[in-house]
Amino acid sequence: MKSKKINFLMGNIKKIGILTSGGDCGGLNAAIRSIFFRANTKYNMEVFGIRDGTIGLTKRPVDVEKLTHETFKGYLLRQGGTFLGSNNKGNNFKFPKNGKVVDTSKLIIEGYKSLNLDGLIIIGGDGSMQILKKLADKGKMNIVAIPKTIDNDVGATENSIGFHTAVDVATQALDNLQSTAASHRRSMILEVMGRDAGHIALNAGIAGGADVILIPEIKYSINGVIKKLNEMKKNKIQHSLIIVAEAVKKEDGSKVMHKYLDGEKRLGGIGDYIASEIMKKTEIECRVTTLGHVQRGAPPTANDRILASAFGVYAVDLLANKKFNRMVAWNNRRVVDVAIDEGIKTYRDVQRDDPLVETALSLGAYIGEIK
């Protein structure tokens, strides 16, 4: 994919908004900062941050903050999460409120129009972009999208904001677990996020030296896992590291779901299942660590800060040139743009021919029943 040249023409885009939607991750504040500086310094635009995603647009008056240089004097660049707040509670066309499901799309569109914005930059994952694109079409909103997700599963971009930070956190966890595994001669199992994509588990597994890497895209067997652990024992290695993505299924094909305090059922618990099955069939002692939200809230890595900053600059240039309904992407070591529809219609999971799969195999990891 060739990089598309942006012509830096001054238009009549003078007032823009930013919102972050969906789950938080490292690099969001860096993106917001970059958007502000490009818009303000290059184009003399006013920039407004909308609080708590689309929820800020449903409030009356709308919940916004005018961004200034003063806003970014502190440590926002280095902080995880988003200082504007976010929301991942579902579809705005079917939004849960006071025990009911309501359509908040009209409120959001009215809120957007009340601000007299010339354009809106949305920072979100595939689900958020799908909903916001639908809102934009209905309300004739001028939007540009920036992809962010620790899962790295947004189509049409090789990298999304937040992924590198999540991998770094998972790698550090494996580093820490290795010493305790060796001390007690145990098998330590680390369960990581990623939804239906195994990018975090695969990348962190390689970086952290995992002996077993289980991802949703490649079928495995408990016997295959045990065979690997027994081979290690024969080589006088009495401890092991296993990393497993949250959407890996049981051997019978069912997903493991956990019911949380809010009543919602979400992916979680596959690590305990793997440990239980290993201990049923062997004398290997297992312990499980579920990494959870620390993958989202950690300070962003240098890679995520750089990617977010580059995305922010490019997104502002798209708005300035009235190139709406585009998504910023990273392909072939360059920032490019694609239609938002292209970004949300494709799903980016781990392919069998991914070079990192072969890398993991070459390093001796068990990664499933690969023929």
Features from the language model and the residues they span:
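Short, acidic/small-residue loops that bind anionic groups at enzyme active sites
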Residues: I50, L135-S160, L214-I218
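Short glycine/serine/threonine-rich phosphate/pyrophosphate-binding segments
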Residues: C25-I35, L57-T58, V102-K106, L120-K133, ...
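C-terminal non-catalytic interaction/assembly regions of soluble proteins
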Residues: R266-K371
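A glycine- and small-aliphatic-rich helix-loop capping segment at beta-alpha/alpha-beta transitions
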Residues: R33-K42, D63-E70, K134-V144, I161-T165, ...
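N-terminal phosphate-binding or glycine-rich loops at protein starts, especially the Walker A/P-loop
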Residues: I6-P61
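Accessory alpha-helical/coil subdomains and C-terminal extensions
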Residues: G111, I122-G124, Q130-K134, G139, ...
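Short glycine-rich or small-residue beta-strand-to-loop segments that form or flank ligand, phosphate
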Residues: K15-D24, F83-G85, D118-I122, M188-E191
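Glycine-rich oxoanion-binding loops at beta->alpha junctions
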Residues: M1-M10, P61-L120, G127, I161-D168, ...
